[in-house]
Amino acid sequence: QVCPYYKDLNDPRVVSSIALVHQRFSTNTFPSWELAHPYRMIAHNGEINTVKGNFNWLRARERAVETAVLGDDVKKLLPIIYEGQSDTACLDNMLELLVMSGYPLAQAVMLTIPEAWEQAKGQMDPAQRAFYEYYAAMLEPWDGPAAVGFTDGVRIGAVLDRNGLRPGRYILTNDDIVILASEAGTLPIPQSQIKKKWRLQPGKMFMIDTEQGRIIEDEEIKRTLALSNPYKEWTKRLNIHLSDVVAPPPLPNNNPVPLIKRQEAFGYGEDDIKFVLRPMAEKGAEAIGSMGNDTPLAMLSHRAKPFYQYFRQLFAQVTNPPIDPIREQLVMSLVSFVGPRPNLLDINNVNPPLRLELSQPILGMEEMAKMRRIDRYTGDKFRSYEIDTTYRVAWGEEGVEARLASLCARAVDAVKDGYNILILTDRKMSEERVAIPMPLAISAIHQHLIAAGLRTNTGLVIETGSAFQTHHMAVLAAYGAEAIHPYLALETIEQLYKPGNPSGIDVKTATQNYIHAIGKTFKKIMSKMGISTYMSYRGAQ
C-alpha cells in the first residue's frame, strides 16, 4: 500500500535500516489524511487523554520559554502546538521541541511519558526515581492508553503508558531483525528464525541505536540517564515538602459572621451536611448512592444553585478505557507542585527555582497556616500574597466584572513584585461583602497570567468556603488551582465533632478522614477520564 503511493520508495537507492509504519482504522474521529501517522518523530496507538491540559500548559510556558540552543529563533516556533491538531500531532510537536532543544531522544520520551514513580518508593531505583521527581515540576505527564513508536532517524524505539493499556510485542530474529508491533505475528517469521520474543511492560521503553548497532533495554536507558546528573542531590536541595515545614501555631478564627450564616451564604444545606460531609468525616469515603442524576440541570432549576453545579464531569468513551482507582492506585498520583516552574528548555540550568511539593492538593488548617507564612519557613524563597475575592454588595451585578478586572491587575502586580504563591480567598465574605464564585475568580486570574506570560512564575492556592464536595474541588483544579483549602467545610466538621459528640470520633480523625475521602474521590473523577495524575488534570478545563 505504501510503495505505490510514495514512488520514491520504489527507487533502489532508497535504503534504510529502520521503518516506522502505522496502519489502523479511526475509532472516535473521522478518518482523514491530516490525522495519518507517522508524524515527524512518532506513531501512536491509543489516546492522550490529558492533551487539553498539556496544550494549555504549553501555551502558558510559551511566553517564558528560553533555550541556549535555539536562542532568539525559539520565538519563530510559536505557537509550539496549533489548535485543532490530533493528540498525536501535539505530542509529536512537544517531543520534537525537546529533542531540538538538546534533550536526548530517550530522555525526551521519559519526560513526556514517565513511569508511575510516585508510589514506587522502595521498588524503583532511587536515582531513577529522583530523575522523575526532578522533571515532574517542569512538565506534567502526557497520560492515556498509549503505545508510542518514536525515531530521530538514527535511533528507533517504543514506550508504553504507565498503565500498560495498549499492547506492544516484539521479536528478534537470528539475523538481527527486530519487529515490534501492537500484536504478535504481524509479519510471517518462521519460529525457527526467532531468537527472542517479549513484550513492552507498563512504562517501559525499548530502543535500537543504529550507530552503535545494538538493542538498548529499558534498564540501561534509564540507568544511564538517571546517573548523567546528580538528580538525587538536586531534588534534596530543591524540593521542599510542605509536610516537612515546621508547623506554625494555628491562626485564630476571628470571623465575626456566625458559622450558620456563612454556610447559608455559600449554599450549604442540611442534606449536604448529612449526606456529604458526615459520611466523609466518619468513614473516609463518600456516601454510596445510586447511579445517575435526576435533578434538574442548574440552568433550568428554579432554585439558586452553586456555581459548581453548572459544570459536568467528562468521561472516557469508545476505545478509551477508564482506570480502576482502587485496584490500580499504584499508578495514580495526587502529587502537586506549588510555585514557579523551571524553564523546561534550559537543560543546563545550574540554579533552578525551588519547588514546594504537596503529597495531595487538599490543605488542612495546619497546612494552610504554613502556606500563609511560607516566607518565614523558607527564608523568603517562597513568598505568598493574599488576594481577597469578595466585593461590596452595594456594587450590584456590575461589581463582578469590575472586581475581576482589579483581581487580575493585582495578581500581575504581585507576581512582578516577586510573590511566587498567590492565595485567592473569600474569607472576608460578610453581610456587606459578597464572594465572587471561586471558579470564576481562579479561571480569570489563571488566564490573565497566561496572557501576561507570568503563569509559570507563580502558584495559585484557593482558600474558599464554597467548596465542600469533591466535584467542587475538581472544578477548581481544572481551572488552574495547585492547592485548595476548603476552610468552611473543615470548620463545619470541627463543630460536628466537638468532644462529647455521639459518634465518638474526634475532630482530628474526622478532618483526616474528610481529606482522605476527597483524595480518594478525586482519583475516581480523574480515572473516569483515564487520567492518572493530578498534575495532568490540573488546568485542563
Regions found by a protein language model. Give the residues of each.
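Charge-patterned, long linear interaction tracts outside catalytic cores
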Residues: 527-541
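Conserved short alpha-helical segments that host acidic/polar catalytic motifs at enzyme active sites
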Residues: 1-349, 375-377
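Short, solvent-exposed coil/turn linker segments
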Residues: 1-8, 104, 217, 364, ...
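Glycine-rich phosphate/ribose-binding loops and adjacent secondary-structure elements
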Residues: 16, 21-75, 101, 115-147, ...
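Non-catalytic terminal/interface segments that mediate subunit docking, oligomerization
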Residues: 10-14, 37, 283, 287, ...
